[in-house]
Amino acid sequence: MDHLHTIAHACADARTVLIDGRSGSGKTTFAAALARLTGHEVIHLDDFYPDWWGLNDAMSMVAHDVLHPTHPGYQRWNWETSTPGEWVNLDPERPRIVEGVGAVNEASIRAAQKRGKVVSIRLHLDAQTRKQRALTRDPAFADWWDVWAAQEDARGEQLPVDYELG
């Protein structure tokens, strides 16, 4: 997190910060640290991925729901019942950090630009360390690691971002 203060300064007047990276790369930890410095609200894609096969759906939800210009929000995913949960309303005026696999995509960048200044960040970490972190956080992820990694791989070439870390 050597660059945290530099990035926080760049994000201070941003309406939207998008933080992407593969599972276990440190997105949630970085977002929390950045939010402490900027006061931005943090939205976690983990709260609304629709099941283990839902990466593409969640990516669309960022642009259409989370970054909606007048009625932003998202539908939580209930991981215990594998069903949609309650709707969460967001304040359209509040600056936010959106973090998770798939946060940076063409549609989310376009939607974020309509809100004002956007800063995009991608975190990198080697696969072995990422897997160890992810499974330490949630041992049940072991059964789904390959399914999720395949969706990450299928995203193909990544868009350029303002900051590449790792």
Predicted regions and their residues:
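Small-molecule kinase domains that catalyze NTP-dependent phosphoryl transfer to phosphate-bearing small molecules
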Residues: T136-G166
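Conserved lysine of the Walker
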Residues: K27
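ATP-dependent NMP and nucleoside kinases share a basic, alpha-helical "lid"
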Residues: W87-R137
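Extreme N-terminal, non-catalytic leader segments
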Residues: M1-T16
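Hydrophobic anchor at the beta1->P-loop junction of P-loop NTPases
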Residues: I19
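P-loop (Walker A) phosphate-binding loop of NTP-binding proteins
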Residues: R22
